[in-house]
Amino acid sequence: MEKTEIKNGSEIYDTVRELLCLFGADSVQTVEFTDSSHGDLDIRHNYLIDRKYVLRINSAPVMTDGRLEELNRLIERYREFGMHAPKFLKAKDGRFIVERDGNICYLSEYLDETVADDVKDGCLEELRTQRRIFIARFAEKYRNVDLTETVSMYSIFDLSPYDKLDGLEIDEKHDNFNHLTADLQKAGEYALAERLVQENESIRRELRSFYKELPRCVFQGDENFSNLCVDENRRISGLFDFNMSGTEVIANYLANAALNFFYTDEIMQSRSADEIYRMLTKAYAESTELIRKYYNFTPQEFRAYRLYSKIAMYSAYWNTSAFSEYLAQEQCAEKVVRLLWKIAEEDFRA
Protein backbone atom coordinates (compact mmCIF):
# COMPACT_ATOMS: atom_id res chain seq x y z
CA MET A 1 0.00 0.00 0.00
CA GLU A 2 1.16 3.49 -0.80
CA LYS A 3 2.37 5.59 2.13
CA THR A 4 1.68 9.33 2.38
CA GLU A 5 3.76 11.55 4.64
CA ILE A 6 1.70 13.66 7.06
CA LYS A 7 3.21 17.12 7.44
CA ASN A 8 3.90 18.73 10.81
CA GLY A 9 1.33 21.43 11.47
CA SER A 10 -1.51 19.76 9.59
CA GLU A 11 -4.76 18.94 11.35
CA ILE A 12 -4.20 15.20 10.99
CA TYR A 13 -0.66 15.47 12.39
CA ASP A 14 -1.98 17.31 15.44
CA THR A 15 -4.71 14.69 15.92
CA VAL A 16 -2.16 11.88 15.78
CA ARG A 17 0.08 13.65 18.29
CA GLU A 18 -2.87 14.25 20.61
CA LEU A 19 -3.94 10.61 20.45
CA LEU A 20 -0.39 9.41 20.99
CA CYS A 21 -0.19 11.48 24.17
CA LEU A 22 -3.09 9.45 25.55
CA PHE A 23 -0.86 6.39 25.25
CA GLY A 24 1.99 8.09 27.10
CA ALA A 25 4.18 8.89 24.09
CA ASP A 26 4.69 12.63 23.66
CA SER A 27 7.33 12.85 20.94
CA VAL A 28 6.31 12.70 17.28
CA GLN A 29 8.76 13.32 14.45
CA THR A 30 7.47 11.55 11.34
CA VAL A 31 4.01 10.25 10.47
CA GLU A 32 3.25 8.10 7.41
CA PHE A 33 -0.34 7.29 6.44
CA THR A 34 -1.76 4.24 4.65
CA ASP A 35 -5.43 3.67 3.91
CA SER A 36 -6.63 0.06 3.96
CA SER A 37 -10.33 0.94 4.16
CA HIS A 38 -12.97 -1.30 2.62
CA GLY A 39 -15.35 1.42 1.50
CA ASP A 40 -16.86 4.32 3.41
CA LEU A 41 -18.53 2.06 5.97
CA ASP A 42 -15.34 0.23 6.93
CA ILE A 43 -12.65 2.85 7.50
CA ARG A 44 -9.17 1.52 8.32
CA HIS A 45 -6.59 4.30 8.66
CA ASN A 46 -3.04 3.42 9.70
CA TYR A 47 -0.41 5.88 10.90
CA LEU A 48 3.23 4.79 11.18
CA ILE A 49 4.86 7.03 13.80
CA ASP A 50 8.66 7.42 13.93
CA ARG A 51 8.91 3.82 12.70
CA LYS A 52 8.22 2.82 16.32
CA TYR A 53 4.43 2.72 16.60
CA VAL A 54 1.36 2.09 14.45
CA LEU A 55 -1.80 4.00 15.33
CA ARG A 56 -4.93 2.50 13.82
CA ILE A 57 -8.21 4.39 13.49
CA ASN A 58 -11.12 2.17 12.46
CA SER A 59 -14.84 2.71 12.10
CA ALA A 60 -15.86 -0.94 12.50
CA PRO A 61 -16.31 -2.09 16.12
CA VAL A 62 -14.41 -5.36 15.54
CA MET A 63 -11.56 -4.53 17.91
CA THR A 64 -12.39 -4.25 21.60
CA ASP A 65 -10.30 -4.23 24.77
CA GLY A 66 -11.08 -7.90 25.26
CA ARG A 67 -10.12 -8.74 21.69
CA LEU A 68 -6.80 -6.88 21.92
CA GLU A 69 -6.06 -8.57 25.24
CA GLU A 70 -6.53 -12.01 23.67
CA LEU A 71 -4.40 -10.97 20.69
CA ASN A 72 -1.57 -9.96 23.01
CA ARG A 73 -1.70 -13.43 24.55
CA LEU A 74 -1.44 -14.93 21.07
CA ILE A 75 1.42 -12.57 20.18
CA GLU A 76 3.22 -13.72 23.31
CA ARG A 77 2.92 -17.33 22.09
CA TYR A 78 4.43 -16.40 18.73
CA ARG A 79 7.30 -14.71 20.59
CA GLU A 80 7.75 -17.82 22.72
CA PHE A 81 7.82 -19.78 19.46
CA GLY A 82 10.77 -17.68 18.30
CA MET A 83 9.00 -15.14 16.10
CA HIS A 84 9.15 -11.37 16.37
CA ALA A 85 5.67 -9.90 16.74
CA PRO A 86 4.51 -6.38 17.75
CA LYS A 87 2.29 -6.11 20.83
CA PHE A 88 -0.64 -3.76 21.40
CA LEU A 89 -0.06 -0.99 23.93
CA LYS A 90 -2.39 0.32 26.61
CA ALA A 91 -3.37 3.96 27.04
CA LYS A 92 -2.77 5.81 30.30
CA ASP A 93 -6.24 4.84 31.55
CA GLY A 94 -5.35 1.13 31.31
CA ARG A 95 -7.50 0.43 28.24
CA PHE A 96 -6.36 -0.46 24.75
CA ILE A 97 -9.12 1.46 22.96
CA VAL A 98 -9.49 5.23 22.70
CA GLU A 99 -12.66 6.53 21.04
CA ARG A 100 -12.54 9.58 18.80
CA ASP A 101 -15.27 11.00 16.52
CA GLY A 102 -17.17 7.72 16.45
CA ASN A 103 -14.07 5.70 15.56
CA ILE A 104 -11.94 3.38 17.66
CA CYS A 105 -8.21 4.07 17.97
CA TYR A 106 -5.52 1.71 19.22
CA LEU A 107 -1.73 1.58 19.22
CA SER A 108 0.81 -1.15 18.63
CA GLU A 109 4.54 -1.50 18.38
CA TYR A 110 6.01 -1.41 14.86
CA LEU A 111 8.07 -4.31 13.54
CA ASP A 112 10.81 -2.52 11.60
CA GLU A 113 12.14 -5.49 9.67
CA THR A 114 12.36 -6.64 6.06
CA VAL A 115 8.99 -7.78 4.71
CA ALA A 116 9.02 -11.07 2.80
CA ASP A 117 7.00 -9.56 -0.05
CA ASP A 118 9.91 -7.22 -0.82
CA VAL A 119 12.52 -9.96 -1.23
CA LYS A 120 10.51 -12.96 -2.43
CA ASP A 121 11.90 -12.86 -5.99
CA GLY A 122 14.39 -15.68 -6.32
CA CYS A 123 13.29 -17.49 -3.17
CA LEU A 124 9.51 -17.73 -3.54
CA GLU A 125 9.21 -21.52 -3.30
CA GLU A 126 11.59 -21.64 -0.34
CA LEU A 127 9.50 -19.03 1.49
CA ARG A 128 6.30 -20.94 0.75
CA THR A 129 7.90 -24.10 2.15
CA GLN A 130 9.07 -22.25 5.26
CA ARG A 131 5.57 -20.87 5.76
CA ARG A 132 3.91 -24.29 5.63
CA ILE A 133 6.46 -25.74 8.06
CA PHE A 134 6.10 -22.78 10.42
CA ILE A 135 2.29 -23.06 10.50
CA ALA A 136 2.36 -26.85 11.01
CA ARG A 137 4.91 -26.62 13.83
CA PHE A 138 2.95 -23.85 15.54
CA ALA A 139 -0.24 -25.93 15.36
CA GLU A 140 1.55 -28.95 16.82
CA LYS A 141 2.94 -26.94 19.75
CA TYR A 142 -0.18 -24.92 20.60
CA ARG A 143 -2.95 -27.40 19.86
CA ASN A 144 -6.02 -26.50 22.00
CA VAL A 145 -4.09 -23.80 23.93
CA ASP A 146 -6.01 -20.70 25.14
CA LEU A 147 -8.75 -20.96 22.51
CA THR A 148 -10.89 -17.89 21.82
CA GLU A 149 -14.51 -17.45 20.83
CA THR A 150 -13.39 -15.41 17.81
CA VAL A 151 -12.89 -17.69 14.81
CA SER A 152 -10.52 -17.16 11.90
CA MET A 153 -11.39 -16.07 8.36
CA TYR A 154 -10.78 -19.65 7.18
CA SER A 155 -13.66 -20.91 9.30
CA ILE A 156 -16.25 -23.23 7.81
CA PHE A 157 -19.75 -23.03 9.35
CA ASP A 158 -18.90 -20.57 12.15
CA LEU A 159 -18.73 -16.90 11.14
CA SER A 160 -15.68 -14.71 11.66
CA PRO A 161 -16.07 -11.07 12.78
CA TYR A 162 -15.47 -9.87 9.22
CA ASP A 163 -18.08 -12.28 7.82
CA LYS A 164 -20.56 -10.68 10.20
CA LEU A 165 -19.31 -7.18 9.34
CA ASP A 166 -19.96 -7.87 5.65
CA GLY A 167 -23.51 -8.93 6.51
CA LEU A 168 -22.94 -12.55 5.54
CA GLU A 169 -25.11 -15.32 6.93
CA ILE A 170 -22.74 -17.97 5.55
CA ASP A 171 -18.99 -18.44 5.88
CA GLU A 172 -16.65 -16.77 3.38
CA LYS A 173 -15.88 -19.96 1.44
CA HIS A 174 -19.57 -20.66 0.99
CA ASP A 175 -19.97 -17.10 -0.30
CA ASN A 176 -17.03 -17.58 -2.70
CA PHE A 177 -18.57 -20.84 -3.88
CA ASN A 178 -21.93 -19.19 -4.53
CA HIS A 179 -20.25 -16.56 -6.70
CA LEU A 180 -18.51 -19.29 -8.71
CA THR A 181 -21.67 -21.31 -9.31
CA ALA A 182 -23.52 -18.13 -10.29
CA ASP A 183 -20.81 -17.42 -12.89
CA LEU A 184 -21.11 -20.98 -14.19
CA GLN A 185 -24.86 -20.58 -14.57
CA LYS A 186 -24.37 -17.29 -16.44
CA ALA A 187 -22.09 -19.20 -18.80
CA GLY A 188 -24.83 -21.79 -19.35
CA GLU A 189 -23.05 -24.51 -17.35
CA TYR A 190 -26.07 -25.44 -15.25
CA ALA A 191 -25.24 -29.14 -14.94
CA LEU A 192 -21.73 -28.40 -13.69
CA ALA A 193 -23.00 -25.83 -11.21
CA GLU A 194 -25.52 -28.33 -9.87
CA ARG A 195 -22.89 -31.08 -9.62
CA LEU A 196 -20.59 -28.80 -7.64
CA VAL A 197 -23.46 -27.84 -5.34
CA GLN A 198 -24.18 -31.52 -4.69
CA GLU A 199 -20.51 -32.23 -3.94
CA ASN A 200 -20.17 -29.19 -1.70
CA GLU A 201 -23.31 -30.07 0.27
CA SER A 202 -22.17 -33.67 0.67
CA ILE A 203 -18.74 -32.70 2.01
CA ARG A 204 -20.13 -30.03 4.31
CA ARG A 205 -22.75 -32.43 5.65
CA GLU A 206 -20.06 -34.97 6.51
CA LEU A 207 -17.83 -32.35 8.14
CA ARG A 208 -20.69 -30.86 10.13
CA SER A 209 -21.26 -34.24 11.76
CA PHE A 210 -17.91 -34.20 13.57
CA TYR A 211 -15.96 -30.94 13.08
CA LYS A 212 -16.73 -29.71 16.61
CA GLU A 213 -14.78 -32.67 18.02
CA LEU A 214 -11.56 -31.71 16.19
CA PRO A 215 -8.48 -30.07 17.77
CA ARG A 216 -8.15 -26.32 17.32
CA CYS A 217 -5.50 -23.65 17.54
CA VAL A 218 -5.44 -19.85 17.56
CA PHE A 219 -3.57 -18.57 14.49
CA GLN A 220 -2.45 -15.18 13.18
CA GLY A 221 -4.85 -15.89 10.34
CA ASP A 222 -3.25 -14.08 7.40
CA GLU A 223 0.29 -15.31 6.77
CA ASN A 224 0.70 -13.75 3.34
CA PHE A 225 4.11 -12.37 2.45
CA SER A 226 3.07 -8.78 3.12
CA ASN A 227 2.58 -9.76 6.79
CA LEU A 228 5.71 -11.87 7.27
CA CYS A 229 9.23 -10.61 8.02
CA VAL A 230 12.50 -12.26 7.10
CA ASP A 231 16.05 -12.04 8.43
CA GLU A 232 19.24 -11.41 6.44
CA ASN A 233 19.22 -15.07 5.33
CA ARG A 234 15.63 -14.76 4.08
CA ARG A 235 14.33 -16.98 6.85
CA ILE A 236 10.91 -16.12 8.23
CA SER A 237 11.59 -14.30 11.48
CA GLY A 238 8.41 -12.47 12.43
CA LEU A 239 4.84 -11.57 11.61
CA PHE A 240 2.39 -8.74 12.16
CA ASP A 241 -1.20 -7.66 11.39
CA PHE A 242 -3.33 -9.81 13.68
CA ASN A 243 -6.72 -8.47 12.49
CA MET A 244 -7.74 -11.84 11.04
CA SER A 245 -6.56 -13.89 14.02
CA GLY A 246 -8.85 -16.44 15.54
CA THR A 247 -9.45 -19.99 16.64
CA GLU A 248 -9.61 -22.53 13.84
CA VAL A 249 -9.96 -26.26 13.33
CA ILE A 250 -6.34 -27.23 12.72
CA ALA A 251 -7.21 -29.63 9.90
CA ASN A 252 -8.99 -26.83 8.05
CA TYR A 253 -6.20 -24.31 8.60
CA LEU A 254 -3.57 -26.74 7.36
CA ALA A 255 -5.71 -27.67 4.35
CA ASN A 256 -5.64 -24.01 3.33
CA ALA A 257 -1.93 -23.67 4.11
CA ALA A 258 -1.31 -26.61 1.78
CA LEU A 259 -2.67 -24.76 -1.26
CA ASN A 260 0.39 -24.45 -3.46
CA PHE A 261 -0.88 -24.36 -7.03
CA PHE A 262 -1.52 -21.07 -8.77
CA TYR A 263 -3.47 -20.62 -11.99
CA THR A 264 -1.46 -18.45 -14.39
CA ASP A 265 -1.97 -17.35 -17.98
CA GLU A 266 0.90 -19.56 -19.08
CA ILE A 267 -0.57 -22.67 -17.45
CA MET A 268 -4.15 -22.00 -18.50
CA GLN A 269 -3.21 -21.29 -22.11
CA SER A 270 -0.60 -24.00 -22.68
CA ARG A 271 -1.84 -26.99 -20.64
CA SER A 272 -4.85 -29.24 -21.00
CA ALA A 273 -7.44 -29.55 -18.24
CA ASP A 274 -6.18 -33.06 -17.45
CA GLU A 275 -2.60 -31.81 -17.17
CA ILE A 276 -3.66 -28.94 -14.93
CA TYR A 277 -5.57 -31.32 -12.66
CA ARG A 278 -2.51 -33.57 -12.35
CA MET A 279 -0.34 -30.54 -11.53
CA LEU A 280 -2.88 -29.38 -8.95
CA THR A 281 -3.16 -32.71 -7.16
CA LYS A 282 0.61 -33.31 -7.30
CA ALA A 283 1.29 -29.92 -5.67
CA TYR A 284 -1.27 -30.64 -2.97
CA ALA A 285 0.13 -34.11 -2.28
CA GLU A 286 3.63 -32.66 -1.88
CA SER A 287 2.36 -29.99 0.53
CA THR A 288 0.49 -32.59 2.53
CA GLU A 289 3.56 -34.82 2.79
CA LEU A 290 5.57 -31.85 4.10
CA ILE A 291 2.92 -30.81 6.63
CA ARG A 292 2.64 -34.35 8.00
CA LYS A 293 6.33 -34.28 8.92
CA TYR A 294 5.62 -31.47 11.40
CA TYR A 295 2.02 -32.01 12.48
CA ASN A 296 0.72 -35.31 13.82
CA PHE A 297 -2.85 -35.79 12.60
CA THR A 298 -5.17 -38.17 14.38
CA PRO A 299 -7.02 -40.47 11.94
CA GLN A 300 -10.18 -38.40 12.45
CA GLU A 301 -8.27 -35.17 11.80
CA PHE A 302 -6.77 -36.49 8.58
CA ARG A 303 -10.20 -37.58 7.41
CA ALA A 304 -11.33 -33.99 8.00
CA TYR A 305 -8.19 -32.60 6.34
CA ARG A 306 -9.04 -34.43 3.13
CA LEU A 307 -12.58 -33.03 3.16
CA TYR A 308 -11.45 -29.49 3.96
CA SER A 309 -8.86 -29.80 1.18
CA LYS A 310 -11.48 -30.36 -1.47
CA ILE A 311 -13.54 -27.42 -0.23
CA ALA A 312 -10.42 -25.25 -0.45
CA MET A 313 -9.74 -26.51 -3.95
CA TYR A 314 -12.94 -24.99 -5.33
CA SER A 315 -13.92 -22.44 -2.65
CA ALA A 316 -10.73 -20.65 -1.57
CA TYR A 317 -10.92 -17.10 -2.87
CA TRP A 318 -7.80 -17.20 -5.06
CA ASN A 319 -9.14 -20.38 -6.72
CA THR A 320 -12.73 -19.24 -7.28
CA SER A 321 -11.57 -15.87 -8.59
CA ALA A 322 -9.19 -17.61 -11.03
CA PHE A 323 -11.93 -19.96 -12.24
CA SER A 324 -14.31 -17.05 -12.83
CA GLU A 325 -11.61 -14.99 -14.55
CA TYR A 326 -10.63 -17.74 -17.01
CA LEU A 327 -14.23 -18.83 -17.52
CA ALA A 328 -14.83 -15.38 -19.00
CA GLN A 329 -11.98 -15.87 -21.51
CA GLU A 330 -13.12 -17.64 -24.66
CA GLN A 331 -9.84 -19.50 -25.17
CA CYS A 332 -9.89 -20.88 -21.59
CA ALA A 333 -13.59 -21.35 -20.81
CA GLU A 334 -13.91 -24.94 -22.03
CA LYS A 335 -10.75 -25.88 -20.15
CA VAL A 336 -12.09 -24.40 -16.88
CA VAL A 337 -15.33 -26.32 -17.29
CA ARG A 338 -13.54 -29.64 -17.82
CA LEU A 339 -11.20 -28.94 -14.90
CA LEU A 340 -14.10 -28.19 -12.56
CA TRP A 341 -15.88 -31.37 -13.68
CA LYS A 342 -12.75 -33.33 -12.75
CA ILE A 343 -12.53 -31.60 -9.37
CA ALA A 344 -16.20 -32.37 -8.72
CA GLU A 345 -16.11 -35.98 -9.92
CA GLU A 346 -12.67 -37.26 -8.94
CA ASP A 347 -12.17 -38.92 -5.56
CA PHE A 348 -9.55 -36.34 -4.60
CA ARG A 349 -7.17 -37.42 -1.86
CA ALA A 350 -4.86 -34.84 -0.32
Show the residue positions of the predicted features:
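Alpha-helical scaffolds flanking conserved acidic
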Residues: 299-313
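Active-site acidic catalytic loop and adjacent metal/ATP-binding pocket
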Residues: 39-51, 55, 202-252
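Conserved NTP-binding catalytic cores of kinases and kinase-like/nucleotidyltransferase enzymes
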Residues: 1-96, 231-232
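ATP/Mg2+ or Mg2+-diphosphate-binding catalytic cores
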Residues: 311-350
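An alpha-helical support segment within catalytic cores of ATP-dependent transferases
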Residues: 16, 20, 172-221
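Active-site activation/catalytic loop segments of kinase-like enzymes and analogous catalytic loops
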Residues: 251-294, 309-327
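ATP-binding pocket architecture of kinase catalytic cores
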Residues: 51-150
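A cross-family kinase active-site recognition segment
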Residues: 125-188
